[in-house]
Each structure stands twice: as C-alpha cells, then as structure tokens.
Amino acid sequence: MQQLLIASRAIEQLLSSIGRIAAWLLLPMMLVIIVDVITRKFGLLTITKDFFLATEMHGAHNIVNKYITSTKMQELEWHLHAALFLLCMGFGYVKNSHVRIEIVREKFDVYTKSWLEVIGIVIFIIPYTYLLFRYGLNFTERSFHLNEVSAALTGLSHRWIIKAFLPLGMALLFLAALAVLLRNLVFLFGSKEES
C-alpha cells in the first residue's frame, strides 16, 4: 500500500507542476483580450494600417494585415482559454478544488465519501477520459493531415495545435483520477499509518 501512496504523490506532484506552469497562460490570455478589446473599441488596427499605407511602409502594413487581425485575436483568446482549462483540469482535481454537488455527499461519513469517489472514478472518469483521449487523438490527427485552418478567412492556421490539447488534457485528468483513486484505495484498505 505504501507504493500506491508514493505513486499517488508522484502523480500529484507532476500534475501540480504542470498546473502551476500552465496557469501562467492566464497572463498572455488577459493581454490578448485587453489588446483585442482596445483595438476594436478605438479602431486602432484600422488607424495603424492607414498610417503604414500613408507613410508608404507597405511591409509594416502587410505584417499588421497578415498577423494582427481582430479574428486572429479572438481565436487566440479561446485557444489560450482552452489550453489553460485543459492543462489545469487534472491539477484542480488532485487539489480537490473542482465544483462538487454536496447535497447527498455531505451527509456521509469519510469512508462512504471515499467509496463514492472510487465508484465515480471507475464508472465515470476513467471511461470518459479514455473515450475523449482516444477520439481526441483521431480528431487531432485528422486536423493535422488535412492541414486544417480556421473557418474564418483571416483566422489562425494550424488548428491541430489547439485540438491536441484535448487528448493531452484528458491524459492529465486520467492521471489525476488515478492519483485520487490510489489515495482512496490506501485510505480504504491500508493501515491507519498509511492513510
């Protein structure tokens, strides 16, 4: 049982490290949102493009026109948001910081709660993460081979990159479920010192 606890803690440390690093995606996401809102509100992209055209800096105009569009900014916002969510989901689960509906669960003792957690992991989380991981890989691979781009004319290319976060996030959530499962098994079947 001690090995299960060691494995659980190792997985939790890995997920904590990934979650803490991924949480930094919040800063570029906020920056992109702020820039997008300000440029759309005040029409700064149009002003910038007009300035470069008026001063005959066509190279700079082409860069702004090609790389910085409102559509690309909006798509980058949701790409960063999806990556942040998927990379931190496992971290949230091992830290028990996700939302729970405590209507029924709060009335039970610790052992019953632990059994509910084990049953929930085995019946719901493991099959769910497996299916989304498996189909997410196919989804990503198909996108990569088709060289899928945004449906918007001026949107982001390489759509497979964001789609790859789905199987990655599900793998991390599976690891989190495994860590919580091991921890609960040690609690239920191990000695008092181990739990």
Model-derived regions, located:
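Alpha-helical transmembrane segments and membrane-interface helix-loop junctions
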Residues: 1-195
